[in-house]
A protein has these predicted regions:
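Canonical tetratricopeptide repeat
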Residues: 5, 39, 73, 107, ...
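Helix-start (N-cap) detector for alpha-helical repeat units in TPR-like alpha-solenoids
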Residues: 34-35, 68-69, 101-103, 136-137, ...
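Structural signature of tandem alpha-helical TPR/SEL1-like repeats
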Residues: 12-24, 47-59, 81-95, 114-127, ...
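Terminal, low-structured helical/coil segments at or just beyond the last alpha-helical repeat
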Residues: 1-7, 185-217
């Protein structure tokens, strides 16, 4: 096992200090290795030092402007800091450099949603789901985007698939209930709101929606 692999293994085990030590050694031995800078940045990000992590990602990009993973990692930090324009730029750069993963499509789609560009987000969220059909959260966000664009029938399909993958995804259940209500299927909507409240009794939106439908009956 080479040092990079060992460092990644330490990260997977949550041994951040050991991982940082290994990646620091790699950088000292080979200061032109962009992968080591990305990995060190990932350690810093994991322990909450986003500002320093960004510097390591920028260094990796300086060493090799085609290091797609550095753009992606920087994008995730900008997203978490609500700097969505910068995040969008980073995810787009990662894509241009060849990072066509479900995660990158998902994060770019999510970023565009935050920028109120749902119509542009839709194909990226769709591609994310196509690349990883078992990702419940991607299904949910794709469904949400469809619903916001009033593509209710398509949204229902995604919410249902999300719940198949994660039987306790209350957000998907709630939004499925809202979609059914929108389609004037009150009984199906109530069934969903009841399921939400069974799992999460303090779900205020589901409780309110249930009362609204019951009072309209």
């Amino acid at each position: 096992m080479d040092k990079n692999q060992l460092g990644v293994q330490y990260m997977q085990e949550g041994k951040w200090e050991e991982a940082a030590k290994i990646f620091n050694e790699i950088i000292e031995e080979n200061p032109n290795d962009p992968i080591a800078y990305i990995n060190f940045g990932n350690v810093l990000s994991a322990v909450g030092d986003d500002e320093k992590a960004l510097k390591f990602y920028q260094k990796a990009i300086e060493l090799d402007e085609n290091t797609a993973a550095a753009y992606y990692s920087a994008g995730t930090i900008y997203f978490s800091l609500d700097q969505f324009d910068k995040a969008k730029n980073m995810f787009e750069q990662a894509m241009k450099k060849g990072l066509h993963t479900s995660d990158n499509y998902f994060m770019l789609g999510l970023t565009l949603v935050q920028l109120d560009q749902g119509k542009f987000a839709l194909p990226y969220l769709q591609r994310s789901v196509e690349l990883n059909e078992e990702d419940a959260e991607a299904r949910f966000q794709y469904g949400l985007c469809l619903a916001q664009l009033e593509l209710i029938d398509e949204a229902i399909v995604q919410f249902e698939k999300c719940i198949e993958l994660d039987e306790e995804h209350t957000d998907a259940m709630y939004n499925l209930g809202v979609s059914y209500a929108f389609k004037e299927k009150a009984d199906k909507a109530l069934e969903m709101f009841d399921k939400v409240l069974e799992i999460q009794p303090d779900h205020l939106l589901a409780g309110h929606a249930k009362k609204l439908i019951e009072s309209a009956k």
